[in-house]
Amino acid sequence: RPPRSTPKPSSAASDVYKRQDKNKEEHYNLISALHKSLRGSDVDAALYWLARMLIGGEDPNYISRRLLRFASEDIGMADPNAVTHAISCWDGYKRIGSPEGDLFLAQSVIYLATAPKSNAAYKALSNAVSVAKQN
C-alpha cells in the first residue's frame, strides 16, 4: 500500500528531489514530513521520509534526536515507554552503524507512528512556564 502522504516528484525534478540539502529548505521539509507522518500514524509515509533522509545523507544522530523529541513531545504520557524505545534504538544505531543500524531507526519510526499520541506533558510544562514568568 502506498504511503498516504507521499508526494510524487516530476521526472525533471527527480535528481533534485532525491538529493538532501542540509543547509536549505529541503532539509526542514523532510523532517517536517516525517513528523507529520508520525503524528498522523502513517507508518508507510514515515518510513518513506526516513528513507529519503537516509539516502540523502542526513546525519542519523540528527534523525534520532528528532525521534526522541517526538517520543516525549507528541507521545509523552500516552506511552511513556516511547522515550525508552527511542533511546534504545538510537543506542543500537550508534553501536552498529549504517547500513545495518538503519533498521533501528526504522524500528523507532514504526513504534512512534503506531503509538498513542498525547502532548499533555508538553502543554502542562508550557502553561507552568507561562505562569512562572508572570510571577
Predicted regions and their residues:
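Conserved helicase/translocase motor-coupling segment
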Residues: 19-50
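Non-catalytic accessory segments flanking P-loop/AAA+ NTPase cores
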Residues: 11-15, 27, 130-135
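Single conserved hydrophobic/aromatic residue that forms the stacking wall/gate
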Residues: 1-13, 17
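Conserved acidic
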Residues: 1, 5, 30, 59, ...
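Charged catalytic carboxylate motif
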Residues: 12, 45, 104
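N-terminal alpha-helical segment
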Residues: 9, 26-30, 45-46, 63-64, ...
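Terminal-proximal interaction/regulatory segments of ATP-powered molecular machines
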Residues: 53-135
